[in-house]
Every structure is written in structure tokens, then in C-alpha cells.
């Protein structure tokens, strides 16, 4: 009896070799792109590094006509606005995610989840325009003025809420950033909370645990790595945001007060505002060094988050 011919020819060794080469090439391209970005940033910013050295990091003055540049104000604005954004966004996102996964009725879960995803899809320039023309005037009248009056007599804390209520400034930029990153963090938290085995939660409810106890003793310990990942995703988004912050932060190189009401600047805003108009080679180099600093900050945040997740996983495995 004649052997039947197979319907298709199985891939040979040659196909495996080609596929392996293509996959390795794709991975190599990623590394080459990363290395190319780092090298190009260092080369482009080298004149500024040579002239100002490490003093560039703590110099407040930024005087383009006289070729005097310092990164302290943009670094301060970037870090403070991102911290404010996380301070607001993390608890709000946590509450949204828990409501969607544990408390929301079935008919509400899907529409609310879609609404959160739509918020994440809104372009940042729309947030910036809304923040400048709608949010800032209301923020000045209904938050900055009354809170400033209440806090003005409190030592130390009062200094953070002193000064005129402009509506725009570091605090306003932080709030806008928080609104922008809430959908990202909430979506990630919701997804990781849904990964908690239903059997574990039902067992906890079966022995008399309340919803609060199930959340704190079952859901959070099981999903803490994913929660940290979501928070770091939001932080990365806040650090790199440009247009919305440019609209609302004030774009001034002043650091004469600790007040969060005062206008300031961020690294991304400085780059967006000045790069097209930079004329001298040193000015361009200083802006490129700002980009290098932002790259380093982002890398440190990512490395810290990875280290934290590894430590948590290691401690969990040791139990």
C-alpha cells in the first residue's frame, strides 16, 4: 500500500534558523536603539557638561542671553509635580479599582470601566487646555484662596500654601497630572485585582471575613507586585508628560519660595518651550542635558520599581 503524502511539509531546520535569527535581531535592535539614545544624548549635551559640570544640577539661574544655565528649577518642578500627582492618584485609583472588582453591581462595572479607559485616551493637550481655561480659574477661587487663608498661620505647612492664588502653578500642574494618570493606575489595579482567585475570596467570606478584611488580607497581598507596577506606570507617565504641564505650570525659572501656588517649570516644559528657539550651541547642549537628566530619573525610577518587586517576590517565596 502506497504511503500517503502529508498535507503540508513540516518546517525544516532552515526555517528554525531563520526564525531564530530574526528574533535575536529584533532583540538586538532594541538594545541598539537604547544605546544610541544614551550616546546621542551624552554627545549632544557634552559642551554643557564640560562648562557647568555637576553645578548644573543645583544652579537655579537660567539666562539664555548670557549663556548661563542651571537645571534645579526644572528638576524641582518635575519631581514635585509628579509626587503631588502620585499622592492624589494612588488612593483614588485604588478606590476605583476596588469598587469595580469588589463592590460595584454587575450592571455598572462595564460602563464605568469603559469610562476609565476613555479618560486614558484623551490627548494630553486637551487636558492642558481644559486645565488652563476651566480648571485654573475655579481652582484659584475655590481651593487656593480658602486653603491659603486657613493654612497661612500654620508653621512650615503654611509656607507651602502661601502667596497669591494664580490658579496656575506647581500644585495645579500636579492636580492635572493626577487626573491624567488616574485612568492608567486604576486600569492596571483593576486588572490585577481580578487575578485574585475567586476560591480564596469566597473562602475568606465563608469564615466570616468582611469585605475590608478580604481586601487587606487576601486581595492586596496576592496582587502587591502588580499594584506597584501600576503605580510606577503612572509615575513614568507623570515624569514624561509635556503638553498638559506646559499649559498649567507657569513656565518660569523661579524658585524663591517653597509655595506650591507659585509658577514653576519642568524638564519637559523647558524642552517644549525653548528647543525650537535655541540658537547658541551651549543653549542646545543645556537643553539636551535636561533630556539626559530626565532619562536618568526615569531609569532610576524603573530600576527602583524592579528592585522593589524582586524583593517582594523574594520575601514572598521565603515564607
For every predicted segment, state its role.
Residues 5-17, 21-22, 42-85, 105-106, ...:
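Periplasmic/extracellular loop-to-transmembrane helix junction in inner-membrane transport proteins
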Residues 85-116, 306-314:
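Transmembrane-helix boundary motif in ABC transporter permease subunits
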Residues 1-27, 305-319:
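Transmembrane alpha-helical segments of polytopic membrane transport and secretion proteins
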